[in-house]
């Protein structure tokens, strides 16, 4: 396994050049891969596996919208598409790709279907790490493994189709067969991962929950809203406030940072922007550090898990969620955003 230097720290990384798709096919040649859940990660991983020549079946609540989506994607009821319990019985590798709350709901049925030597696969460590709250405690005679793509289901599929793939982390929680790591890496390669980073279930879930609530979404949304509100309070128009807060970030700067790094970005902007950004970055870092410390503590002690399971399991959850999302969508900031997005250069081209 090659090592790569990340900021002065040597880390092991599995590559698709070292562990080829051909090798993955050999490792998984006698496996039936059951994908439980056809919502977010399910379609991408299932279709990538199918396109790479692996035997895949889907387990989904019969007749719901996701069942119909699976049919539209080419899975056939009674052949490659089954109710959840039936699909779990047929598989040798059971991919638990339902929502976290969904996994808790179906676990008692899935557990009864597991056979000695099966592999129970996750793309998120939530159910296993917070077992005291989820009740997900696998039997000792199955492998318990994880491959967590570093991107949404949409990107897992999109990148696979354009040939680039997506990187993933992987972990083994329980090795009952002596083949758990080999199976895990093979499954990571099979869904299109070019590089696989070793982790643990615990580290994956702690970093993932912190990231989602932090920079990736929660902190990002909150910070953008705060700046937009300050600009509006001081008389800037909605379009100007949105452009200076969101549009320049998403359409220009973040792409350049992704390609070249933050040091390059600082070196390739106006001297006024450069000096100001360098001066203010530490202030923002120090201001939000206590919030991140608090967030990480809540993730680690299970407080965030308790909230997720309580709220997401409520009978009126979807109704309340729609109201929350509608409030955001109908806010001045994001209504301004919709108008600004319509004026992007690529949309002007479509009108001609």
Curated annotation (Swiss-Prot):
Gene Ontology biological-process entries: isoleucine biosynthetic process; L-valine biosynthetic process
Positions annotated to bind Mg(2+) 2: 208, 244, 248
Free-text remark on how the cofactor is bound: Binds 2 magnesium ions per subunit.
Any matching Pfam family: KARI_C
Positions annotated to bind substrate: 270
Entry cofactors: Mg(2+)
Chain residues that bind NAD(+): 38-41, 100-103, 153
Domain KARI N-terminal Rossmann residues, every copy: 11-199
EC number: 1.1.1.382
SUPFAM superfamilies cross-referenced by the UniProt entry: 6-phosphogluconate dehydrogenase C-terminal domain-like, NAD(P)-binding Rossmann-fold domains
Gene3D superfamilies assigned to the protein according to its UniProt record, in alphabetical order: N-(1-d-carboxylethyl)-l-norvaline Dehydrogenase, domain 2, NAD(P)-binding Rossmann-like Domain
Ranges for domain KARI C-terminal knotted: 200-347
Keywords: Amino-acid biosynthesis, Branched-chain amino acid biosynthesis, Isomerase, Magnesium, Metal-binding, NAD, Oxidoreductase
Binding residues for Mg(2+) 1: 208, 212
An annotated Gene Ontology molecular function: metal ion binding
Pathway it works in: Amino-acid biosynthesis; L-isoleucine biosynthesis; L-isoleucine from 2-oxobutanoate: step 2/4; Amino-acid biosynthesis; L-valine biosynthesis; L-valine from pyruvate: step 2/4
Catalytic reaction equation(s): (2R)-2,3-dihydroxy-3-methylbutanoate + NAD(+) = (2S)-2-acetolactate + NADH + H(+)
Active-site residues annotated for this sequence: 124
Record-linked InterPro entries: 6-PGluconate_DH-like_C_sf (IPR008927), 6PGD_dom2 (IPR013328), KARI (IPR013023), KARI_C (IPR000506), KARI_N (IPR013116), NAD(P)-bd_dom_sf (IPR036291)
Function statement: Involved in the biosynthesis of branched-chain amino acids (BCAA). Catalyzes an alkyl-migration followed by a ketol-acid reduction of (S)-2-acetolactate (S2AL) to yield (R)-2,3-dihydroxy-isovalerate. In the isomerase reaction, S2AL is rearranged via a Mg-dependent methyl migration to produce 3-hydroxy-3-methyl-2-ketobutyrate (HMKB). In the reductase reaction, this 2-ketoacid undergoes a metal-dependent reduction by NADH to yield (R)-2,3-dihydroxy-isovalerate.
Family: Belongs to the ketol-acid reductoisomerase family.
Protein name: Ketol-acid reductoisomerase (NAD(+))
Organism of origin: Desulfosudis oleivorans (strain DSM 6200 / JCM 39069 / Hxd3)
């Amino acid at each position: 396994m090659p090592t790569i230097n990340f900021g002065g720290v040597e880390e092991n990384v599995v590559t698709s050049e070292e562990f080829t798709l051909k090798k993955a096919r050999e490792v998984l040649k006698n496996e039936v891969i059951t994908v439980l859940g056809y919502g977010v990660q399910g379609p991408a991983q299932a279709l990538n596996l199918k396109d790479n020549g692996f035997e895949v079946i889907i387990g989904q609540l019969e007749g719901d919208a996701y069942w119909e989506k699976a049919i539209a994607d080419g899975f056939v009821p009674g052949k490659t598409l089954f109710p959840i319990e039936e699909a779990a019985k047929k598989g040798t590798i059971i991919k638990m790709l339902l929502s976290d709350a969904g996994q808790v709901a179906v676990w008692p049925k899935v557990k009864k279907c597991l056979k000695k030597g099966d592999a129970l696969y996750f793309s998120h460590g939530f159910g296993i790490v917070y077992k005291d709250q989820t009740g997900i405690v696998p039997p000792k005679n199955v492998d318990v493994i994880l491959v967590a793509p570093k991107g949404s289901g949409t990107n897992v599929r999109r990148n696979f189709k354009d040939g680039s793939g997506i990187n993933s982390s992987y972990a083994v929680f329980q090795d009952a067969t002596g083949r758990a790591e080999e199976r895990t890496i093979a499954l990571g390669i099979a869904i299109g991962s070019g590089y696989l980073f070793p982790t643990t279930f615990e580290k994956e879930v702690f970093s993932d929950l912190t990231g989602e609530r932090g920079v990736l979404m929660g902190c990002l949304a909150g910070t953008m809203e705060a700046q937009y509100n300050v600009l509006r309070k001081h008389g800037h128009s909605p379009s100007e406030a949105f452009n200076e807060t969101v549009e320049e970030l998403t359409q220009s700067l973040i792409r350049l940072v992704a390609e070249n790094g933050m040091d390059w970005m600082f070196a390739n902007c106006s001297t006024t922007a450069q000096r100001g950004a360098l001066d203010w970055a530490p202030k923002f870092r120090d201001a939000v550090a206590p919030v991140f410390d608090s967030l990480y503590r809540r993730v680690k002690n299970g407080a965030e898990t308790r909230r997720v399971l309580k709220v997401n399991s409520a009978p009126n959850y979807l109704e309340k969620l729609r109201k929350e999302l509608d409030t955001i969508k109908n806010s001045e900031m994001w209504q301004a955003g919709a108008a600004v997005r319509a004026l992007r250069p690529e949309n002007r081209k479509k009108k001609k």
